[in-house]
Amino acid sequence: GESNEKGLLKALEKRGMEHAGIEKFESNDVDVVPQLTRLKENGADSLFVVANVAPTAQVIKSLDRMGWDVPISSHWGPAGGRFTELAGKSGEKVHFIQTYLFTDPANPMFVKLQEKFPEIETLADVTPATGIANAYDATLLIAAAIEKAGSTDGPAIREAMYEISGVEGMIKTYDKPFTPDDQDALGPEDYTFAHFVEGQIIPIK
């Protein structure tokens, strides 16, 4: 959460915006009404939560107990596991970022997943697809760099990472995704907001 806090503060500063407050809670907290009350009293008109499934669910339950209906966004944290089961119907209000979503059961990669893991019966059984796509694409990028380097030597692979191009992943085709000054292969255009609808992660139009 702390690294996200720094990034969010920079983003607010860049836009000349102020925040109503920053509150913290532990992963095993079951009541965050006091923190949320302070934010509400400070005039917060929306919330951004950085937490994983269970603690985010507790935030939603606390909001329900307060009767505070406020827009809430998050990083990828709520996308995994049993979020809507833990948070209840109000969990569908949370908008979170994703890099990839399965929206078609005929998707070739989804079909392969079903063949590999028979317990996957519907699109709702894959939460989140982002985790699969990120890992799959990262593996392809490393493989391309190893092939380019002609070696499994670490420094050689690192240098080859700056030269790879045309790697077709699930999220996108990567053309020169890395430079010495930019180690992130994904940019703002590669993210989308989504939310749960009846257990399935759906993109927000």
Language-model features, listed with the residues they occupy:
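Extracytosolic ligand-binding ectodomains
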Residues: 1-205
